Regions:
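Conserved small-residue
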Residues: 47-53, 57, 64-163, 279
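Extracytoplasmic gating/loop element in the C-terminal half of outer-membrane beta-barrel translocons
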Residues: 137, 187-272
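Outer-membrane beta-barrel "beta-signal"
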Residues: 58-61, 78, 298-310
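Membrane-embedded beta-barrel scaffold of Gram-negative outer-membrane proteins
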Residues: 1-40, 73, 80
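Transmembrane beta-strands of outer-membrane beta-barrel pores
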Residues: 21-27, 63-65, 79-85, 177-179, ...
Length: 310
């Protein structure tokens, strides 16, 4: 790992922070690779051969805009930009080596939607390029013939986007007025993409005609998509998952000297997950691994509490 950083502070440390550039190389990742015939008892072996590189910049700033006897305000902000790329997956360079299929999805048997490939970000989506009608509706089963051989085969799949964000932001702030205290924390993610597996596995008309003669649930997006059968590998289901999320807001009041002129009592209320702004069509764009199979939204919670110090 290589990094260059700078810590700074101004105005009697009322403004502090840091900036850092890093290059992080991860080596000897395990991969299941082919080996020449006759060199082993099997044609494939598990071995430490993979390399991954991360390059990025991190910036943070903490400030106290107001600091008075009865009123204070502090704020913290950070931003991280990072790019990852796989640099090696086999013992020797092999242009014909496709990569490592990963990212299992619901629908079909053994289907995957992601791949680790040299020269691309980890967990890149491996999909077909969807063709659309003039009205913007995807045309079922019609994809771009990327290799120009006149037919649609696995060779026409391409690596499209990735789950990791390009830029990530964080914000915290706290305002104190006399015995009142208000704090909040939020995050933003830009450039992360999500495979909407809920949509790909539920938004097609054949689900309405089940052979057991009972109705299944379908997504309302079926009206815009219009597929009769599932098209799991269409890039139509790879969607921008950029978001702005407010994690929590907390308001409290502290009663001083309530226990025989000593100690204090703090009463507070917290609203968790109060706000999410995103163009993603699913319930929540913040999913682990970039594959969304979640049919239940993240809960919004209200907490009340009391802290007593003697």
């Amino acid at each position: 790992t290589y990094n260059v950083g700078l810590d700074y502070g101004f105005l009697d440390d009322r403004i502090t922070g840091s900036i850092e550039y890093h290059i992080r190389e991860t080596k000897d990742l395990i991969n299941f690779i082919p080996v020449p015939a006759g060199t082993n008892l099997t044609n494939f072996i598990n071995t430490n051969v993979g390399d991954l590189e991360n390059r990025g910049v991190e910036f943070s700033i903490n400030a106290i805009p107001v600091r008075k006897q009865d009123f204070s305000w502090d704020i913290g902000f950070n931003v991280t930009a990072n790019e990852n790329k796989i640099t090696r997956l086999t013992a020797t360079d092999d242009p014909s080596y496709l990569g490592v299929l990963t990212g299992g999805i619901s629908g079909g048997v053994g289907n995957t939607i992601q791949i680790h490939s040299v020269g691309f970000p980890a967990n890149s989506f491996l999909v077909y390029e969807q063709v659309y009608a003039e009205n913007g509706q995807p045309i079922e089963g019609l994809y771009v013939d990327r290799d120009g051989d006149g037919q649609i085969t696995a060779d026409d799949q391409y690596r499209f986007k990735k789950p990791a964000p390009d830029v990530f932001f964080g914000l915290t702030t706290n305002v104190t007025y006399k015995n009142f205290d208000l704090s909040l924390a939020g995050r933003a993610s830009i450039g992360n993409y999500v495979y909407n597996n809920v949509q790909s596995n539920n938004a097609f008309y054949d689900r309405l005609f089940h052979p057991t003669l009972y109705l299944l649930n379908v997504q309302s997006d079926i009206n815009e998509i219009g597929f009769d059968t599932p098209e799991y590998f269409s890039d139509h289901f790879i969607q921008d998952g950029s978001f702005l999320r407010l994690d929590h807001i907390t308001l409290s009041y502290t009663f001083n000297e309530v226990f025989k002129k000593s100690g204090n009592l703090r009463v507070y209320g917290t609203l968790q997950n109060p706000l999410l702004i995103s163009n993603y069509t699913g319930l929540d764009p913040e999913v682990f691994g970039g594959i969304d199979s979640n049919i239940y939204p993240r809960s919004r919670t209200i907490l009340f509490g009391v802290n007593a110090n003697f």
